[in-house]
Amino acid sequence: MKNKHFDPKGKMPSPFTIELQNGWRQTLPFEDKRDFEEAQKGFIAAPPYKQIIAEAGNVAWDMGSYEFLLRGFDSVFDSIHPSLQRQAVLNMAYGLYEVLPDNIYQVRGFDLANMTIIKGNTGWILFDVLTCKETAKAALELVNEHLGHRRVVAVVYSHSHVDHYGGVRGVVDEANVKNGKVQIIAPVGFMEYAIAENVYSGTAMVRRAFFQYGLLLPRSPFGHVDQSIGKNTAAGNTGLIEPTRYIEQDIEELTIDGVKMVFQNTPGTEAPAEMNTYFP
């Protein structure tokens, strides 16, 4: 059994794997580069750093550890499925982007999820405030640096998974939520499922993620590459502030800071408690 055990530095793929990967390269439409063009639309700025340090002193986020992917999309990694490599390169978008001119922005590449920022009459409405306090705080600082400082008037949790609410304490003070200066909006059942899903299934979900995404492997063509919907989950200070307003009906309309939003409850889709938001 000598040399049959796992080598943390990786090893070259077998001829069978290479044959399979080459088959996908010839079958799928990799010549279509539109997604790469669209992924860079509206780019405003990237921060001067690639790491975000957690309050505990560990590295909460390290975008630089994935730069092996930027050798160029035409680089062939026989150890990575071609579709995963393509998606991993697309997920290297890092910084502040304009989505709807002078109205809607996104910070991408700071966590597994993106933070979406809506410009109200006087302040910011934040959608999905990332996994941890440190990455969310850094994202908001980037927004205020390039778009002008505004206070946060509302936060919207789209659903009950931690990468969409765990960074809330990095962008708002709980005292301002309690005194009514900041609203937090979430779908009905949010608190129940945000807590219960982690209590009942959290250990199993984390264990699954280690196998599913290779989270404990070195970041390399032979190890951890991407999580497909994003690079990874930030490893910082996760928190939760209870919503002040629940969307309980199938369809509800709400105007905050001059911005009209139409909410549609969609429970049991990607999460047990979830909703869509439409801007008329």
Which role fits each region the language model picked out?
Residues 1-88:
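N-terminal pre-domain segments of enzymes
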Residues 74-86, 142-145, 152, 174-176, ...:
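Non-globular, low-confidence helical/coil segments that flank catalytic cores
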Residues 81-99, 237, 249:
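Short acidic, Pro/Gly- and aromatic-enriched capping/linker segments at domain boundaries
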Residues 89-150, 274-279:
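Conserved beta-strand hairpin/beta-sheet module of binuclear metal-dependent hydrolase folds
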Residues 99, 185, 189-268, 272-273:
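Metallo-beta-lactamase
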Residues 111-114, 131-134, 160-163, 190-193, ...:
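Solvent-exposed loop/turn segments at secondary-structure junctions
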Residues 122-123, 133-185:
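Active-site metal-binding motif and surrounding structural segment of the metallo-beta-lactamase
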Residues 267, 279-280:
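Structured mid-domain segments that build the active-site/substrate or prosthetic-cofactor binding neighborhood
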